[in-house]
């Protein structure tokens, strides 16, 4: 099979904005998704609502990674949409300063510049519960424990060394 990204480059497609995901037979998939047979494929950039959601989720992922590196004991909560952004609550045991925000922004830019790949991990739900429990992500643990699903998938940045997970 070929990844959606390979197909995109193979057809030399040109979008005015970076492609962030695709619909395969009308189902949203990441660009690492492998296609094995003939499929209807629609590549998406940020002009599409699904593409914009993918882009925003990836930025939240980068934010979580930056915060976890700069404030290992900190807790970040992405709570709800506000205007054209999201309300976030960062708890690091003291008031957040402008310098903290600047450091987070700088680290996010560095992470983006590293061009780290997102990897989809599929495993037994019990394994995912263990992974999220070790990282103190108790809200995800509770959700998975009551999901009734035998298998779960999650995404990670980097398979080796430091990884950040999101459900």
Where are these regions (language model features)?
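Non-catalytic interaction/regulatory segments
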Residues: 82, 91-167
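Ubiquitin-like/PB1-type beta-grasp interaction modules and other compact soluble beta-rich domains
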Residues: 1-60, 64-83, 103-110
